[in-house]
């Protein structure tokens, strides 16, 4: 297989596109974020990268935020939240989001999203064009119909990713390739 040398870029398959929520000037605001991920499993922490000029970043000053995982059926609303600024548009009203709160009053959550994480800011790293916000997950809410045997089911959640590289489109998950920590046994066992 021939390889070509490309310019340095973070060409890692992105995790799901999420809607990051903050309270800005007393009102809930959401923005679409593609650069996010799991930062730690214990304590549970997630990371989101937000451009310095984004309005949502003002709400991070409250030291609380939410990560809402939208399903494929609200891709238009999610995309809209990445196209317009909350400084100019009430995205909650425009998208008809039903907002609720858990114990963190500065971490607005979206009812229409099957998974919601309420987070407290643990660290903020200045990286260049973005700030990396590390948040400790305080609460996790999952829509009951998106569970199978009491566990979140990706086929029911229907997350989607932001396609990077030659295309900038959203993609849903495809078929299963095999069971984790099992399919590799065809090569050998764990030591």
Language model regions located:
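Basic, polyanion-binding surface patches
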Residues: 1-191
């Amino acid at each position: 297989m021939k390889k070509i040398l490309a310019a340095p870029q973070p060409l890692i398959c992105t995790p799901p596109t999420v809607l990051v929520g903050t309270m800005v000037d007393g009102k809930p605001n959401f923005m679409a974020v593609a650069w996010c991920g799991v930062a730690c499993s214990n304590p549970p922490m997630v990371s989101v990268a937000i451009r310095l000029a984004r309005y949502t970043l003002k709400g991070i000053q409250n030291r609380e935020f939410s990560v809402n995982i939208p399903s494929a059926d609200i891709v238009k609303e999610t995309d809209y939240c990445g196209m317009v600024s909350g400084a100019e548009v009430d995205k909650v009203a425009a998208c008809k989001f039903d907002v609720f709160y858990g114990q963190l009053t500065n971490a607005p959550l979206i009812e229409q999203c099957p998974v919601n994480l309420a987070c407290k800011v643990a660290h903020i790293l200045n990286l260049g064009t973005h700030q990396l916000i590390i948040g400790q997950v305080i609460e996790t809410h999952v829509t009951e119909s998106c569970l199978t045997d009491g566990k979140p089911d990706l086929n029911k959640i229907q997350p989607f990713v932001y396609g990077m590289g030659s295309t900038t489109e959203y993609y849903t998950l495809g078929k299963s390739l095999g069971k984790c920590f099992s399919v590799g046994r065809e090569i050998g066992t764990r030591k």
